[in-house]
Amino acid sequence: MNASAIIVAAGSGVRLGRSEPKAFVKIGGRTMLSYSLRVIASISSIKELVIAVPDGFESAARAEVTAAGVRIPVKITCGGAERQDSVRIAIALTSSESDLVVVHDAARPMATTKIFEACLEAASRAGGAIAAIPLADTLKRVVDGAIRETIARASLWQAQTPQAFRRDVLVAAHRRAVDQRIVATDDADLVERTGTRVEVVEGSTANIKITTPSDLGIVEAIVAAKMAE
């Protein structure tokens, strides 16, 4: 099994209240990006990496790749206006010889090697697989400030990344999205629309997406606890 990895690292740090792009914010003395780089570098089935970064941060990303000791070929590209655009741009740079593509958000620095490998294994079997966790909170549908419906959570899962797919399936899904002007918040949504089976592998509650200062604080605490072990 040969896989390409994509790290989506083109997000801004605006909601974090930071001047630097989110992937370059430091946690425990290291950038968010560096955490994903080190995990990907440890997975033997991943043969190449494409990183989508904000315009002007290509050199900074290359320095992170070097510091992380990544030995596979790495391409760095400027991301698009939206996440979906960044992934589409990155897919075009992956090798057509790859069986699978695994997509990961740099804003989830706590994803583990185990989660990546589980996604890749499931995707090789089913066509697609994502990390996710069972929903813990009760959901309410609200209209005009009042509860309209309580949604049963028994079968609901909260999607995370990494998300892995057969390369041909992911390419076709993004091409279809362009042709039909489909906008989605993750790649699994686009792939599901093609009729491909997308399986779920259990992620981790620590694998949160850092969007707000409170998210950053949680991950900083997780990292500090690990460093103290």
Residue ranges of each PLM-predicted region?
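N-terminal glycine-rich phosphate-binding loop and ensuing alpha1 helix
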Residues: M1-S59
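Short, conserved active-site loop motifs that form the nucleotide-linked donor/cofactor pocket
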Residues: A3, P73-K75, L156
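Hydrophobic packing residues within well-ordered alpha-helices of enzyme cores
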Residues: L16, A61-V65, C119, L139, ...
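Short aromatic/basic micro-patch
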Residues: K26, M110, T150, A164, ...
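Conserved N-terminal catalytic core of the sugar/cofactor nucleotidyltransferase
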Residues: S34-S98, V178
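Residues at the starts of beta-strands that form the adenosine-phosphate
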Residues: K47-L49, G128, R197
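Conserved beta-loop-beta/alpha segment of the NTase-like Rossmann-fold superfamily
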Residues: K75, A81-A146, Q160, R167
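Conserved alpha/beta core of the MobA/IspD/sugar-nucleotide pyrophosphorylase nucleotidyltransferase superfamily
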Residues: A81, L156-E229
